[in-house]
């Protein structure tokens, strides 16, 4: 109401997924409602415009099933054109969520969020990410977004979008897909 927002902190816990330990910084329900409102009413619309079709994470109507269907299509298309010639390259951006720099997140958001009050709220939320358990080293405190935040998910999706466009639009590689920080490239050379 008056342009101020007080962040209550994170609930931090660990989980093991596919044999990999993940540190989760989850938001309290009230804070999650603020993030959801900002995502649903602003960020999804302005960020999703720049996503490639073959990015399946965090978008309505997409997800893991969509990515699997696209991978199968890319494999069939490659086989029809090149047979067994070529290869599949998988990638996973190491420490992706914990390495995203806050200054760059805010710089990129400024180009998309025109309303000064909404941009200020967005920046305050990004600054609040410095309180995550996963950002416990002083040098790293201005890096990282939580896995448990919709805003963190949207920012993480956006951050690798220039790579997506380079591979799809500049290199013209049809067999490329990404789900958050994981992806593949199918190439004949």
Regions inferred by a protein language model and the residue ranges of each:
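Reverse-transcriptase-like RNA-dependent polymerase core
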Residues: 2-20, 119-136
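P-loop NTPase nucleotide-binding core
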Residues: 7-8, 55, 113-114
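Generic alpha-helix structural propensity
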Residues: 7-10, 29, 33, 37, ...
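Short, charge-rich binding segments
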Residues: 14-16, 25-30, 77-82
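Active-site-proximal segment of RNA-dependent polymerases
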Residues: 39-91, 95-98
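Conserved polymerase palm-domain catalytic core
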Residues: 74-180, 184-188
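Conserved pre-motif C helix in the palm subdomain of viral-like polymerases
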Residues: 21-52, 141-169
